[in-house]
Amino acid sequence: MTESIDQHDHYLGDRAKNYSAHHDKNLRTRLTTRQEQAVLRKAIEKSGRPKSAMDIPCGTGRFLSVFRDCGVAELTAADASTGMLEVAKHARPDDAVSVLHTSAFDIEMPNNSIDFIACLRFFHHLSVKEDRMQALNELKRVSRKHVAISLWTNGNLASFRRRNKPPPPAVSGYGKRICRRSDEIEPEFLDAGFKIVDHYDVWPMISMWRLYLLQIEET
């Protein structure tokens, strides 16, 4: 278990509000949010329009309305940060959205209890493979079928520009953002018992942001 994630809230005080404001500060950030919402919508629709879904970590709730627009009836917004959850409560499309204080490393939900789980903008903060596998195993345990994961990956202009920049030092738990190679992260998905259904690039050939739609392999 990664103690730094479970015991340290990175977004207390005004940090959560500042995070929310950052993604609405100019045309570029607003367009990126819109594109991220669009690829999430594609993944939800391709998964067969699930009835229940969880967004973990939900952050400030920027993606919650997408689930409702796709017909999700039972929606849970989950995050390890109480600061993020306070902001997310006000971003909920309706009061029926459940709010859960829990960690992606130890999700307080029963096995096979959610049709579709989205884990967005999280995995590129995990520099240690064991942490990534812990999170993948938890997502697989709680999901009935599909998981969507977004992160930074290579094969685009933004990653090419960063090619000579040394990566931040590896730390256990939630750390600085790292561009993960697709030939590194995709085998980890397979090792965790998923198959890759599809992937969606937020800004193809330009941005590092990619969303993977995964499906639990039948045993």
Stretch-by-stretch model annotation:
Residues 144-152:
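Conserved beta-strand signature within the Rossmann-like core of class I S-adenosyl-L-methionine
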Residues 54, 60-105:
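Class I SAM-dependent methyltransferase SAM/SAH-binding core
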Residues 121-125:
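Short catalytic micro-motifs in class I SAM-dependent methyltransferases
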Residues 106-111:
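Short conserved loop adjoining the S-adenosyl-L-methionine
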Residues 118:
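A conserved beta-strand element that flanks and buttresses the S-adenosyl-L-methionine
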Residues 1-47:
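Conserved class I S-adenosyl-L-methionine
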Residues 133-145:
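A short glycine-rich, Lys/Arg-flanked "PGG" loop and its adjoining helix->strand segment in the class I
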Residues 175-192:
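Short alpha-helix
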